[in-house]
Amino acid sequence: MGNELQHRTVLLDEAVESLVTRPDGIYVDGTFGRGGHSRAVLARLGPAGRLIAFDKDPRAIETAQGIGDARFSIVHDSFASMRDALAARGIEKVSGVLLDLGVSSPQVDDPARGFSFRADGPLDMRMDPTRGESAAEWLARASLQELTEVIRDYGEERFAFQIAKALVARRAESDRLGPLDSTGELAQIVGHVVKTREKGKDPATRTFQAIRIHVNQELADLQVVLDAALSLLEQGGRLVVISFHSLEDRIVKRFMQAHASAPAVDRRLPIRAVDLPSPPLKIIGRQFPSEAEVAANPRARSAVMRIAERLTP
């Protein structure tokens, strides 16, 4: 319960203010977490409004089931299933989609979940521990090349190859040492390889991020849900996305820019600008946490929120 109480929703008021444009609309919270955004959205909706939330984490589902509001429903699945899940409920268009990306404080702070290098625990890292392959299972079979690519591409770690070599060497000792199945040992292996220190960062930060992203297919799911949100939004509907690292933010930024720009046409062709299809999105802007919020919640420091609005039906 203590971890539940420690969780602070980032950019709470700003996100809900940007998202909810009509109190009778249908809204989607793609990442329920511990319900901060969902509760705030419900507080702004009228009797006819609806909110459908998604989460992969069974503990988030337990929390959501305690809300007890007829306007609210929860889906135990990735937000990548949004299009199909809403279609199954007869919903074709929504007034807004909110995505609060990344891992939540209760997940990080619970050593049993395997997300943190600060306390020893089982090497799991799955948002939903009942589905898919754990971090330990993946590390036990991944090739040197796959390890290198994941740590380099998802962790932006310049020592990716050296870390991957150390992990393969550790795996070769499994008969003598047992499997690599604890966060503490993984952090120790990375710490022995990464000798340089980034200010305020543990040497294992990038590797843990990379493995977590891979195990949970976070970036692939993000691309799927952005495409789904674009097709689901009604005219005037809002897409609000909060990201916490550059990989996520880059995908969101490029997606919004790509769909807020008129199609490129060879100037030699006899086509007038008014004859071109209008871009489907308008970029509203981006926001960062205030100094006061960062002081109260240091984990908010890296957050950036991007907002776009659907222009066309």
From Swiss-Prot:
Residues that coordinate or bind S-adenosyl-L-methionine: G35, G36, H37, D55, F79, D100, Q107
Gene Ontology MF terms: rRNA (cytosine-N4-)-methyltransferase activity
Compartments where found: Cytoplasm
Cytoplasm is among the record's keywords: yes
Signal peptide feature range: none
Family annotation (InterPro entries): RsmH, SAM-dep_MeTrfase_MraW_recog, SAM-dependent_MTases_sf
Domain of life: Bacteria
Entry keywords, A to Z: Cytoplasm, Methyltransferase, rRNA processing, S-adenosyl-L-methionine, Transferase
Cellular compartments per GO CC: cytoplasm
Family per similarity comment: Belongs to the methyltransferase superfamily. RsmH family.
Biological function: Specifically methylates the N4 position of cytidine in position 1402 (C1402) of 16S rRNA.
Protein name: Ribosomal RNA small subunit methyltransferase H
Protein species of origin: Burkholderia multivorans (strain ATCC 17616 / 249)
Lineage: Bacteria, Pseudomonadati, Pseudomonadota, Betaproteobacteria, Burkholderiales
